[in-house]
Regions:
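Phosphate-handling active-site elements
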Residues: 47-54, 82-92
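N-terminal beta-alpha supersecondary unit
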Residues: 1-65
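Active-site phosphate/pyrophosphate- and oxyanion-stabilizing loops and adjacent acidic/basic residues
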Residues: 43, 79, 97
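Stable alpha-helical structural segments in soluble proteins, enriched in small hydrophobic residues
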Residues: 45-49, 84, 102, 193-201, ...
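Surface "functional belts" at beta-alpha junctions
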Residues: 22, 30-33, 88-188, 202, ...
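DPxDG-like acidic metal-binding loop motif
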Residues: 60-89
Length: 235
């Protein structure tokens, strides 16, 4: 079965095609609007691999947490394609995908995505044979919240993601217990989405199309501004 993976949770979007046996192709694009990047990158990937869209048997979508506009574009694109192609869809956590990409370590894994406003989206994972499992649930907060969680766990840690790179000085407060993953792992990859979604699609444990929504973990700037105006009007 060919599965199409889509991730638009950060400033770098990626599209991938893969099967149970191999990755057929992947393209990552940074610095362009997600609306333009997803459509053009998908066309480019299909042309490059010589695969017709109609051969896709399932879709893996990065559902966040991540950037609001990017997540909305990726999730809606994936859902639309799944509806048109009449294929199953699976939502994959962007943090799960980050941790999955460095699963070969024996250390705990701290996956961290830049949430802007001086905050991170983060979760901590433990490597197990064939993958990772969560030690903590996804959360949003300033870097010291993640540092506090890691201090409490008291283990050596591999920190991965653009959030870990951005706040590496704060993470270094833990001394020699924290190693920073290579910049190549700074963003969730669509290929990891495919790997994580494939077993669920094969077992028919896919998501209900209309129940699949982005995981934001906090309100958007527009929602915060609206709340502030509403409170001001009521005072």
């Amino acid at each position: 079965m060919i599965v199409l993976g889509i991730d638009t949770s950060t400033t770098q979007s990626s599209i991938a095609l893969g099967t149970e046996r191999e990755l057929l192709g992947e393209i990552a694009v940074a610095g362009r609007s997600h609306e333009v990047a997803v459509a053009s990158t998908l066309r480019q990937l299909l042309s490059w691999t010589g695969i017709e869209l109609g051969r896709v048997g399932g879709i893996a979508i990065g559902v966040g947490p991540g950037l609001f506009t990017g997540l909305r574009v990726g999730v809606e694109t994936g859902k639309t394609l799944a509806q048109v192609l009449t294929v199953p869809v699976v939502g994959v956590s962007s943090l799960d995908a980050l941790a999955h990409s460095v699963r070969a370590t024996r250390k705990l894994i701290a996956a961290a995505i830049d949430a802007r406003r001086g905050e991170l989206f983060f979760a901590v994972y433990r490597p197990v044979p064939g993958g990772v499992v969560r030690e903590t649930e996804p959360a949003v907060g300033p870097p010291d919240h993640l540092v506090g969680e890691l201090e409490a766990l008291g283990r050596e840690v591999l920190a991965v993601g653009n959030g870990a790179i951005l706040y590496r000085r704060e993470l270094q407060e833990l001394g020699g217990k924290v190693e920073l993953a290579a910049p190549a792992h700074a963003h969730p990859r669509a290929s990891a989405m495919v790997e994580l979604a494939l077993p669920r699609i094969v077992r028919e444990e896919h998501d209900r199309l209309f129940d699949l929504v982005p995981v934001y973990l906090r309100k958007s700037d527009a929602e915060i501004a609206w709340d502030q105006r509403a409170r001001g009007a009521s005072d």
